[in-house]
Amino acid sequence: QLWPRPHIPP
């Protein structure tokens, strides 16, 4: 990824 993305829980 080129920028921080919100982490989606599995």
From Swiss-Prot:
Its main location: secreted. Coiled coil: none annotated. The keyword Chaperone does not apply. Expressed by the venom gland. GO terms for cellular component: extracellular region. It is found in: Secreted. The modification Pyrrolidone carboxylic acid is found at residue 1. Transmembrane segments: none annotated. GO terms for biological process: regulation of blood pressure. Keywords: Hypotensive agent, Metalloenzyme inhibitor, Metalloprotease inhibitor, Protease inhibitor, Pyrrolidone carboxylic acid, Secreted. GO terms for molecular function: peptidase inhibitor activity. This peptide potentiates the effect of bradykinin on the isolated guinea-pig ileum, does not potentiate the effects of bradykinin upon blood pressure and inhibits the angiotensin-converting enzyme (ACE) from rat plasma. Belongs to the bradykinin-potentiating peptide family. Exists in two forms, due to cis-trans isomerization at Trp-3-Pro-4. This is Bradykinin-potentiating peptide F. It comes from Agkistrodon piscivorus piscivorus. The lineage of its organism: Eukaryota, Metazoa, Chordata, Craniata, Vertebrata.
